[in-house]
Amino acid sequence: MLFIKIEIIAKTLLIINKKYTEIKMDELNVVNNINHAGTWLIRNQELLLRYTINLTSAIIILVVGMFISKIISNGANQVLITRNIDATIAGFLSALMRYIIITFTFIAALGRIGVQTTSVIAILGAAGMAIGLALQGSLSNFAAGVLLVTLRPLKTEEYVDLGSVSGTVLNIHIFYTTLRTLDGKIVVVPNNKIISGNIINYSREPARRNEFIISVSYNSDIDLVIKILRSVIEKEERVIKDKDIIVGLSELAPSSLNFIVRCWSKNHDLNTVYWDLMAKFKKELDKNNINIPFPQLDVHVYKKK
């Protein structure tokens, strides 16, 4: 039936050609060629049907995979943001997840149309290894960025000491972290340097301890000095009273008695409490005629007779 229809189409084309064009065509050759094509289609219709189904399935897999990857990526981004993860890192991780899903979807679609997926995976693996060797330093920073996001030893708006630099954390990117120093400089630190070194976080705890070294002259009354220093501490409202307050003689220095004073205050009050207490210590010691020694140079003049 299909063969008869093809022959009818061939003859119709010949009639149209004779009527509307001046090009002469060999009727027998045209019909034979079309008949051969029709015969091939009849013999391979099952194969063509199978390829059509596989190609359609591959397209459906790609479309569905793209749709699912977008949904999962957006959902992951929202979850990361709700857990107070930096928006830049959340966006990068969600995008990375989307590309991974798309890659596996593409491999599955290729397998559906008969492509050997093992070869594709091998090629992707070799390409990934080459890229990894070329970007070894960047990948180490990327891995360090993932650790910073996961372990969270520091967060934005926290004041940290990274050994070579100290400052407030502005952003934690996937490859680097930016800090603002106390004098307003912006410092970019590779994440690998942060993970491989010591991290001192000054903002994580709500309270911090101030420490003072107060030096007085050797002729001072030790008990009176301790009493004065402790009185100043106890009168300061910003000092946390339920934490240990330590006042004591810590050293007999070459030219002074050194007293150590330790007290706790809220993190955001640390510097102002330190400055105010230092001024109050000096005023109270002066009121009680207790001298604070300072370096002196004795010059002896000898006169020759």
Swiss-Prot record:
Chief location bin: membrane
Molecular function as annotated in GO: mechanosensitive monoatomic ion channel activity
A Pfam family assignment: MS_channel_3rd
Compartments in which it is found: Cell membrane
Keywords: Cell membrane, Membrane, Transmembrane, Transmembrane helix
Superkingdom of this protein's organism: Bacteria
InterPro entries linked: LSM_dom_sf (IPR010920), MS_channel_1st (IPR049142), MS_channel_C (IPR049278), MSC_TM_helix (IPR008910), MscS_archaea/bacteria_type (IPR045275), MscS_beta-dom_sf (IPR023408), MscS_channel_2nd (IPR006685), MscS_channel_C_sf (IPR011066)
GO cellular component entries: plasma membrane
TM region(s), chain numbering: 52-72, 89-109, 120-140
Membrane topology label: Multi-pass membrane protein
UniProt family annotation: Belongs to the MscS (TC 1.A.23) family.
NCBIfam families named among the record's database cross-references: PRK10334.1
Protein name: Uncharacterized MscS family protein BU452
